[in-house]
């Protein structure tokens, strides 16, 4: 087998044999290096519902929008003008590879000519929601409470949060009290999206 390989390789120019060798090495490296898709568990869809009693940053109102960050990912909603009780009802979808990471939500006031004003932030973990997903529940009556998360120093929940089985899927409604600001809350909902070949 070795003799045969050497014989056939001698039929090709040296430069072509080098190209094949380099291509083979690159292919080997690509197989050995884990990609983002390999570590991906699924997608977290965060529906930013609305803001309640947000801080005033302009003359009599604010132009708020929400920025959501997790690890190196950053997404934002549209701006709603002149409203301290805005309704976004907008979905922001993050890829999740580590369920221990927290999500940072920050509200800003949009300004045309100056730097956008910060209107508070809140942080929350997704571990309780992920743990409920790992139960692999099926065929529960819609509205069944699977688990609850209490407000504590470790989260920014304004009230008890429930993970609920709703229309064939798990969702978690959360009300976040904003920090580093005089007032304001943001209501959101978490939902998990499975990917083909992936899972918890």
UniProtKB/Swiss-Prot annotation:
Quote the SUPFAM superfamilies the UniProt record gives: C2 domain (Calcium/lipid-binding domain, CaLB)
One GO biological process term: positive regulation of abscisic acid-activated signaling pathway
Please state where this protein is localized: Cell membrane; Nucleus
Task: Name the Pfam families for this protein.
Answer: C2
Q: List the disulfide bonds.
A: none
Changes seen on gene knockout: When associated with disruption in CAR1, CAR4 and CAR9 genes, reduced sensitivity to abscisic acid (ABA) during seedling establishment and root growth regulation.
Alphabetically ordered keywords of this record: Abscisic acid signaling pathway, Calcium, Cell membrane, GTPase activation, Lipid-binding, Membrane, Metal-binding, Nucleus
Chief localization class?
membrane
UniProt-annotated binding residues for Ca(2+) 2 = 58, 63, 109-111
C2 domain sequence ranges: 22-142
Of which family is this protein a member?
Belongs to the plant CAR protein family.
> Its biological function?
Stimulates the GTPase/ATPase activities of Obg-like ATPases. Mediates the transient calcium-dependent interaction of PYR/PYL/RCAR abscisic acid (ABA) receptors with the plasma membrane and thus regulates ABA sensitivity.
**Per its record, how is this protein called by name?**
Protein C2-DOMAIN ABA-RELATED 5
């Amino acid at each position: 087998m070795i003799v045969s390989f050497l014989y056939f390789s001698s039929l090709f120019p040296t430069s072509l044999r080098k190209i094949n060798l380099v291509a083979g090495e690159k292919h080997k490296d690509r197989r050995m290096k884990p990609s983002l898709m390999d570590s991906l568990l699924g997608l977290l869809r965060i529906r930013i519902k609305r803001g309640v009693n947000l801080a005033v940053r302009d003359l009599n109102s604010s132009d708020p929008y929400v920025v959501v960050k997790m690890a190196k990912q950053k997404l934002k909603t549209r701006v709603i003008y002149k409203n301290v009780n805005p309704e976004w009802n907008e979905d922001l979808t993050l890829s999740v590879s580590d369920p221990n990471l927290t999500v940072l939500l920050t509200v800003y006031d949009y300004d045309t000519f100056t730097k956008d004003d910060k209107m508070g932030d809140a942080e929350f973990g997704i571990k309780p929601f992920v743990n409920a997903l790992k139960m692999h529940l099926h065929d529960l009556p819609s509205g069944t409470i699977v688990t609850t998360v209490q407000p504590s120093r470790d989260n920014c929940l304004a009230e008890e949060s429930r993970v609920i089985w709703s229309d064939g899927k798990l969702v978690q409604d959360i009300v976040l009290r904003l920090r580093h600001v005089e007032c304001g809350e943001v209501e959101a909902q978490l939902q998990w999206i499975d990917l083909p070949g992936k899972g918890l």
